[in-house]
Amino acid sequence: MSEVPQSTSDVHPDAECHLSRYTTLRLGGWATRVVTATSADDLVRGVREAGDRGERILVLAGGSNVVIGDAGFPGTVVLVRSRGLKVIETDTDTVTVRVEAGEPWDELVAHTVANEWSGLECLSGIPGSTGATPIQNVGAYGQEVAETITGVQVYDRVTGTTARIEARDCGFSYRSSIFKRSDRWVVLSVDFRLARSPLSGPVRYAELARALDVAVGDRVPLAKARAAVLRLRAGKGMVLDAADPDTWSVGSFFTNPVLDRAGYERLRERAADVGEPPSWPGTDGTVKVSAAWLIDKSGFGKGHPGPAGVVTISTKHTLALTHRSGTARTEDLVRLAREIRRGVQARFGVTLHPEPVLVNCAL
């Protein structure tokens, strides 16, 4: 475990303490201290020691789903850089793998596809680390990690012990879990049970089915599914590219609103002049509605507010807010997010909620 020296008012902080270098938005202020953990033991030790010093703690891995304020973080940031994957159980039909929290997510997905392990292929191209996936219950193109996670190894900051939390106890819901709702647990590694198959799971997402030229419910070779997802994501600026400011983002900034039936019918009435809102009914009577559609129909199109903006909506996808220059501040991003949220609320009566974790800033 390595440590960047603590910054003080008398000494200019080391460049490694500036958090913009650790986020895909390239935004964020200074941290008091940055510690790098290259193993689960390092991660536990870094969090425990900072806690013993009475410091605030921020655990940061890929930095792809976090917005850090301009004031930075007045405490210790523990960078998760643990790597590794091992098979812990196998049978004729399935394989269970344990993956360290710092393992880059898309490298894991590529590995599973190459080994003909089915279950993660539609989650290709998502930036960030494996340890972040249960926190958000990451999902895309008809798959989410809650379907394949069997358990999560954690450090419990309350008891000071390590433990395994079974999937049934993780509180998985749409883009959320107990790990997002509380900072009590630090994810050390994640177990996934995957099918031993050269074919994808049934294609559930209509856009992906069209890209593959198959019917919803069909299965395709894993590599074909992965390639199609990567193409779709790249077309929306959702695959990291250092040369493309449309990818300097946290991906989808707002979650798709989940409405009860009455709320959905009210939305349909208010949207009657612009068309039927794209929606997906849930099994519990709720309806999930496209946030991208709501944003666009509220007058916030791709590229808003224009090419002169230091932060704008992506030119490829209305759900992504992007950093367009080296001069932007987090407050610029937050101001744009507030404008969009207020506009959607005024137009449709629906409140959008941010998907990323907000640190030292708020909408």
Swiss-Prot record:
The active site is at R175, S252 (proton donor), E355. InterPro entries: FAD-bd_PCMH (IPR016166), FAD-bd_PCMH-like_sf (IPR036318), FAD-bd_PCMH_sub1 (IPR016167), FAD-bd_PCMH_sub2 (IPR016169), MurB (IPR003170), MurB_C (IPR011601), MurB_C_sf (IPR036635), Oxid_FAD_bind_N (IPR006094). Its EC number is 1.3.1.98. Residues 27-197 form the FAD-binding PCMH-type domain. It is found in: Cytoplasm. Its cofactor is FAD. It is an enzyme of class 1 (oxidoreductase). Its main location: cytoplasm. GO terms for biological process: cell division; cell wall organization; peptidoglycan biosynthetic process; regulation of cell shape. The keyword Cell wall biogenesis/degradation applies. Pfam families: FAD_binding_4, MurB_C. GO terms for molecular function: FAD binding; UDP-N-acetylmuramate dehydrogenase activity. One of its GO terms (cellular component) is cytosol. Keywords: Cell cycle, Cell division, Cell shape, Cell wall biogenesis/degradation, Cytoplasm, FAD, Flavoprotein, NADP, Oxidoreductase, Peptidoglycan synthesis. It catalyses: UDP-N-acetyl-alpha-D-muramate + NADP(+) = UDP-N-acetyl-3-O-(1-carboxyvinyl)-alpha-D-glucosamine + NADPH + H(+). The keyword 4Fe-4S does not apply. It comes from the Bacteria. This is UDP-N-acetylenolpyruvoylglucosamine reductase. The gene is murB.
